C-alpha cells in the first residue's frame, strides 16, 4: 500500500471545503411536499416469481450510459433501473417521490431542496448519500467521459448542488422555471462515488463493460456477449415497500435475447421462447397474429390507446451533404414523397401522418404546421427553378454533372416495403433514392458519426419539446451529438437560447411554436408516421391489472421504469403448456383499451 504526503496548506483547504459543504444552512421558510397520496397503478392481485423473456435486435455496443456509442436503445433498460430524485406519475404527471422523500422550492424559482431517503442503497449495499449527487456534477462535467451534451448541460444549465448533511441537498439551475419543469430539467440521478473514485482519460475504455451499481429494482446479473443479457430482481430492494412500488416489478428475471431479425423473433414467440411480442407493425398484426395459437386462446391480443408526446419519426436530411445543403432540394424531396400512399397500402390505414417534429405536447406543439403534402407538380417546379432541369436516360436529374441521387439509411428490414413506394414516386420527380438497410448497430453508428445523407429513425420523447440538442449549431458538424441534420442557423440558435432561458410559461409556449415553424421552414426533417396506440400479443400466463397500462405507456410489456405491472401466473403457464399438447381450447382474446384515447387528432 502506498501513502501520499499532503502538506499542511492542502490539508487545511480540504478540511475547509468539507466543513463548508456540511455547514450550509437550510432556509427557514421551506414548505416541504411529498405527494404520498398519489394513486398506485398496479394490481393487488399481482404475484412474484417467474421470468420474462424478450428480445433485442442487436447487442449493445457498451454498458456505459454516457460517452461514445452509449445512446443506443439498450441504454433505456439501464437508465430505468437507476432512480432519480423524483419522477412523474404516468397517469396524472404529478411529481412523485423516488430517492427523495420530500422536496421544497426556493424563492429564486430555480432551486429545489430534496430530502433523501436514508434507506436508499446501491446494489452493492452501500448507502446513497448527498455526496453521490455532488459527484454527479463532477462526473458529468468531466471531459474524460467524452459526452459533449452532458458536459454542456451540467456545466451551463445546472449551476450548483449543495449538501446539507448526508441526506439533504439542493439543486440550482441557471434560470427560473415552472415547478414541474425544475424537476425535469434540473433533477439529478446519483452517481456512485465509491465505485468510480476518480475519472481519468482511460474512463471510456475502462468502463465499457463494467456493471455499475444501481438503485432500481433490477440489476444485470449475467452477460453472454452477442447472445443475451439477464437482469435479476433484487430480493432486498430498499424501495420495494413504497406504496407506488408495491405489486410491481414482479418477475424474478428479465432475459433479453439478441435476435437480429423480427420475423425470426416472432417464430421464437410462437414457440413459447418469448413471452410477448409487439404487433404495432401492420404486417405482423394482420398477417402473422392469427391462427390456432390465437383461436385456441393460448396467445392473447390487445390494442391499447395512449395519450402522450409522439416520437419524432421521419427522414433526417444531412445539410452537410453537397446536394442536401440546398434548401430547394430538401423542400422538393418532401413534396416528392407519397406518405399517404404508404399509409393506405403497406400500413393498411393503421398509422397516421406525423405533421411536425414535436407533436403531442399540448400548447407547446404548433398545431398550425402541416407536413408538406405529396405534390409532384410542385416538386418538379422547385427543382427546375433550382437548376436541376437536365435529366439522364433513367429520369434522374442532373446539375453540373452531379446526379440527384441520395442514399437513405434505415435499420429495420420490415420498413423496406414502405420506403420502396416512396422511392418509386420520388423518381417521378427526378430524385433517385437508394435504399441502404443496415443492422441496428451500424445504423446507429453511421448516424452518430454524421456519415448519412438521409437517415430514417425516430427520437424518444420528453416532458417538453427539446430544441437545443437537435437543432442548435453547437451540436452541428461534429460526431456523437443529436443534431443529425447539422442544422446551423443563427436565428434559430438565438430563439433556442431564449426558449431555454425563459421563465414565463406563456412566453415559452410562443417561443416553442415559433421554433417549430422555423424548423419546418428549414426543411431538414420530413415527418413520417405516428401511431396513437400500442398493440401486441402475449402468452396467456402473462397477467395484467384491469387497466393494463397507463396514459403514457408506449408498451404494456415494459418490466422496468413506470412499467413492471404485469406478472407471470406459474399455474396458468403449466396449464397452457399442457393444453397445447392435448389440444384443449380457451376463449380467444382480442381486447381494445381506449380510456386514454385522444378525442381529437393533434
Describe every region a protein language model picked out.
Residues 26-40, 51-107, 138, 213:
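N-terminal lobe/hinge region of extracytoplasmic solute-binding protein
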Residues 115, 150-198, 217-224:
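Surface-exposed binding/hinge segments that line
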Residues 82, 89-94, 186-248, 253, ...:
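Gly/Pro-rich hinge or "lid" segments in bacterial periplasmic/extracellular proteins
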Residues 101-146, 170-172, 258, 265-268, ...:
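Aromatic- and charge-enriched surface segment that lines or borders ligand/interaction sites
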Residues 206-209, 237-289, 423, 427-440:
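Ligand-site clamp/hinge motif
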Residues 143, 147, 221-232, 257-321, ...:
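Extracellular/periplasmic solute-recognition and catalytic clefts
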Residues 53, 129-136, 168-172, 178, ...:
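Alpha-helical secondary-structure segments
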Residues 35-37, 56, 77, 224-229, ...:
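Detector for C-terminal structural segments
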Amino acid at each position: 500500500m502506498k501513502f501520499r504526503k499532503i502538506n499542511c496548506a492542502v490539508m487545511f483547504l480540504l478540511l475547509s471545503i468539507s466543513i463548508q459543504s456540511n455547514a450550509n444552512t437550510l432556509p427557514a421558510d421551506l414548505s416541504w411536499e411529498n405527494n404520498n397520496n398519489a394513486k398506485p397503478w398496479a394490481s393487488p392481485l399481482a404475484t412474484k416469481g417467474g421470468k420474462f423473456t424478450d428480445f433485442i435486435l442487436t447487442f449493445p455496443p457498451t454498458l456505459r450510459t454516457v460517452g461514445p456509442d452509449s445512446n443506443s436503445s439498450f441504454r433505456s433498460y439501464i437508465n430505468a433501473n437507476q432512480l432519480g430524485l423524483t419522477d412523474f406519475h404516468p397517469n396524472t404527471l404529478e411529481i412523485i417521490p423516488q430517492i427523495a422523500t420530500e422536496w421544497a422550492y426556493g424563492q429564486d424559482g430555480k432551486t429545489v431542496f430534496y430530502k433523501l431517503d436514508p434507506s436508499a442503497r446501491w446494489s452493492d449495499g452501500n448507502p446513497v448519500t448527498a455526496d453521490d449527487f455532488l459527484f454527479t456534477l463532477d462526473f458529468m462535467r468531466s471531459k474524460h467521459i467524452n459526452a459533449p451534451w452532458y458536459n454542456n448541460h451540467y456545466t451551463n444549465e445546472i449551476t450548483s448542488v449543495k449538501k446539507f448533511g448526508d441526506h439533504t441537498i439542493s439543486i440550482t439551475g441557471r434560470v427560473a422555471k415552472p415547478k414541474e419543469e425544475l424537476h425535469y430539467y434540473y433533477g439529478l440521478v446519483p452517481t456512485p462515488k465509491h465505485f468510480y473514485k476518480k475519472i481519468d482519460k482511460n474512463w471510456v475504455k475502462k468502463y465499457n463493460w463494467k456493471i455499475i451499481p444501481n438503485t432500481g429494482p433490477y440489476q444485470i446479473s449475467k452477460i453472454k456477449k452477442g447472445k443475451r443479457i439477464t437482469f435479476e430482481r433484487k430480493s432486498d430492494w430498499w424501495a420495494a415497500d413504497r406504496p407506488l412500488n408495491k405489486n410491481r416489478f414482479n418477475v424474478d428475471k428479465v432475459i433479453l435475447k439478441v435476435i437480429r431479425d423480427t420475423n425470426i423473433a416472432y417464430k421464437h414467440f410462437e414457440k413459447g421462447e418469448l413471452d410477448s411480442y409487439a404487433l404495432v407493425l401492420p404486417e405482423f398484426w394482420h398477417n402473422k397474429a392469427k391462427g390456432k395459437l390465437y383461436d385456441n386462446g393460448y396467445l392473447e391480443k390487445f390494442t391499447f390507446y395512449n395519450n402522450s408526446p409522439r416520437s419524432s419519426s421521419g427522414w433526417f436530411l444531412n445539410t452537410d451533404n453537397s446536394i442536401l445543403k440546398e434548401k430547394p432540394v430538401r423542400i422538393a424531396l418532401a413534396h416528392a414523397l407519397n406518405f399517404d400512399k404508404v399509409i393506405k397500402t403497406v400500413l393498411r390505414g393503421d398509422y397516421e401522418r406525423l405533421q411536425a417534429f414535436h407533436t403531442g405536447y399540448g400548447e407547446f406543439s404548433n398545431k398550425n404546421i402541416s407536413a408538406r403534402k405529396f405534390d409532384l407538380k410542385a416538386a418538379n417546379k422547385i427543382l427546375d427553378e433550382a437548376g436541376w432541369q437536365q435529366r439522364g436516360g433513367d429520369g434522374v436529374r442532373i446539375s453540373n454533372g452531379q446526379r440527384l441521387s441520395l442514399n437513405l439509411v434505415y435499420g429495420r428490414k420490415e420498413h423496406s416495403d414502405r420506403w420502396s413506394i416512396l422511392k418509386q414516386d420520388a423518381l417521378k420527380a427526378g430524385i433517385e433514392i437508394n435504399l441502404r438497410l443496415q443492422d441496428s448497430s451500424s445504423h446507429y453508428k453511421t448516424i452518430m458519426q454524421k456519415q448519412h445523407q438521409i437517415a430514417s429513425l425516430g427520437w424518444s420523447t420528453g416532458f417538453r419539446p427539446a430544441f437545443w440538442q437537435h437543432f442548435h449549431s453547437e451540436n452541428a458538424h461534429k460526431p456523437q451529438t443529436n443534431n443529425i441534420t447539422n442544422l446551423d442557423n443563427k436565428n434559430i440558435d438565438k430563439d433556442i437560447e431564449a426558449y431555454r432561458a425563459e421563465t414565463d410559461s406563456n412566453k415559452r409556449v410562443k417561443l416553442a411554436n415559433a421554433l417549430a415553424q422555423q424548423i419546418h421552414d428549414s426543411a431538414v426533417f420530413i415527418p413520417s408516421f405516428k401511431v396513437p396506440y400500442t398493440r401486441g400479443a402475449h402468452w396467456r400466463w402473462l397477467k395484467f391489472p384491469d387497466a393494463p397500462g397507463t396514459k403514457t405507456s408506449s408498451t404494456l410489456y415494459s418490466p422496468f421504469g413506470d412499467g413492471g405491472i404485469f406478472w407471470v401466473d406459474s399455474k396458468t403457464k403449466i396449464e397452457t403448456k399442457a393444453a397445447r399438447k392435448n389440444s384443449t381450447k380457451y376463449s380467444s382474446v382480442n381486447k381494445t383499451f381506449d380510456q386514454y384515447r385522444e378525442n381529437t387528432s393533434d
